[in-house]
Amino acid sequence: MSQQVFSAHPALAVDQLQQAEQEEHNTSSNHHQQRSATQSRRHTKAAPKKFTLSRSCAGGGSGTLSGVHQQVKPSPSNPAISPECRKTLPVRTNYAAVDDDDDIECEDVDEVNFGQQEKERERETRQPTKDCGTDETDHVQQRHKNTMTTSATAASRHHHQDGGGGDQSDLSSVISSPSVSTVSSPLSTPTRLPQALQQQLHCCQKSTGMESRARTSPQQIQHPHRQHHQQQHHHHHHHHHLTAAGCTGGGGGGGGSGGSGSCKAKKLDPRLNPSPYRQLLPIALCLLSFAAVFATLIVYMDTTEIRHQQFRLNMSRDYELNGVAQDDPALIDFLRQIHMGKYLGKASPKVAAAASVGVGPPPNSPRLAAAGSTFGSGNSSGSGADQLAHYVADLVGGKMNGAVIQSLSGPLAHLITAPWLSEQLNWMGVLVEPEPRWYFTLRKQNAQRARMQVVHACVSPNTYPKEITIHNEDVRINSLHDEETSWFNSRVKCFPLYTIMLACERTEYDLLSLGVQGHELEILQTLPFDKVKIDVISIHLLEDHEDVADYVLDITRFLAGKSYKLQRKIGRNYFYQRLNASASRTRKKDILLLKTP
């Protein structure tokens, strides 16, 4: 079956309609002709000639004027049309063919399309209701389906009411036809749009068939359907605009451009946008990350502050190891290896050889005699340490290869006599210095003396070791917390005096000098005098020491109980000598005098 196209001009449309009716009457049966004649006589009504022609045109070409594809047999005047070109634009109705003065009613229109019901059903089976080849949004397709269902229901209801007769003339197409600017002129000829533009309007073209059937329904159904069609056309506007832009810009690739336009339409769909919770997800993650980092910093700062407070507490607290005895072998090894072993000075080869041989100046050497005469005469030309050293040498009778142990800290460090005794009498000396600055000074001064040992420690006033903080008032550093200066405090380990003697592997000493700022008596009380042997004990007090007389009296009483006697006082330096040693030395001198002639 070919598609017949009618002109919009009434005269031409009448001629074409008459030719189509003749061919149709020749091929149809007599039964159809009788029924058509009966129905035409039944609906005959007096009307003007002009309106009759228009009515005949409208009745005969109702299928084509309403925008649907009328299928008729091919004829010489109306050649057959290929299947590819079946989609055409709806033929425009000429408003000039209708007389506005005449009163037109739908009941007066002759039914000239009798017998077209079977053809319309056959066309509906061949032509799909909706072409979904082009992507559209879901809500547009759903609205189109609802419209088609409503139109089909209204059309079927109208056919049942008419009893299977033909359709009425398409009067509704005249009422809802396009604007005057789109109406063709009387001399216009039917034209066909290009294939690209036919694809743009496929949605509206395929829906015109259903709309034409819906217009044949009663007027109470026709008006709501027309409003719904206008809304549908408004919703399709954006889709047609994107499709037209794709076809115009892409040419042959109109399908791909239409696909990109549909993708843009999907992006504009509010249902496809991310939910509010998903949009807030990056912000929530950012806040959580910031909170985690901030919490980590707070924990780190608190931990650092706690550690710093613990460190300051450790630096200010004294630890007493009262469970460790002063003659513990582990304690002695610790003191010997840690505090004494790595601080041994390297003497020159000559000094080391002399120390190993034990050679020193003779007792009656002129140098020693000069030193003794100088000290005895009270000449103050020498230093205080040299004067004290000469007096000690006089007390011991100029003994060679003796031993001295001294602990004079702070302001009393200038009274140390061990270096002089080591050089003049080849004595072995042990210097105990707790303050770091004076310790490094003494170590530098005695670096070339092989028999001098400097120990970085303090003498404990108890019989067990301990660790204390030394407050050095003459050393200042910048504070780490504020701009003010703070006193530098150092930590030092204190060992009992007897432990230091055992670490030096010697318990017999010729001289013991103590100047520890008021702790001399406590240190002397820790010594086991039954296990050690000390000839001379010197006590050195500070000038600002309070109650010097009472303190010296207490020391004198304690040493008197240990067989020591105060021999001489030089300033605030007190010298005590063991009585047994002095008596034995006097006895030796008397024996020598008796043997001489």
Swiss-Prot record:
It is a single-pass type II membrane protein. Keywords: Cell membrane, Developmental protein, Endoplasmic reticulum, Golgi apparatus, Membrane, Sensory transduction, Signal-anchor, Transmembrane, Transmembrane helix, Vision. Residues 247-261 have a biased composition (Gly residues). Residues 1-279 are cytoplasmic. Residues 168-193 have a biased composition (Low complexity). GO terms for biological process: behavioral response to ethanol; compound eye photoreceptor cell differentiation; compound eye retinal cell programmed cell death; determination of dorsal identity; determination of genital disc primordium; dorsal appendage formation; endoplasmic reticulum to Golgi vesicle-mediated transport; endosomal transport. Its main location: endoplasmic reticulum. Residues 301-597 are lumenal. It comes from the Eukaryota. In the larval eye disk, expression is first seen at the morphogenetic furrow, then in the developing R2, R5, and R8 cells as well as in the posterior clusters of the disk in additional R cells. The chain crosses the membrane at residues 280-300. It holds the Pfam family Methyltransf_21. Residues 117-141 have a biased composition (Basic and acidic residues). GO terms for cellular component: endoplasmic reticulum; endoplasmic reticulum membrane; Golgi apparatus; Golgi membrane; late endosome membrane; perinuclear endoplasmic reticulum; plasma membrane. Residues 1-85, 111-267 are annotated as: Disordered. Residues 223-242 have a biased composition (Basic residues). It is found in: Endoplasmic reticulum membrane; Golgi apparatus membrane; Cell membrane. Involved in EGF receptor signaling. Has an early role in photoreceptor development. Interacts with the receptor torpedo in the eye. Interacts with Spitz via the lumenal domain and mediates its transport to the Golgi. This is Protein Star.
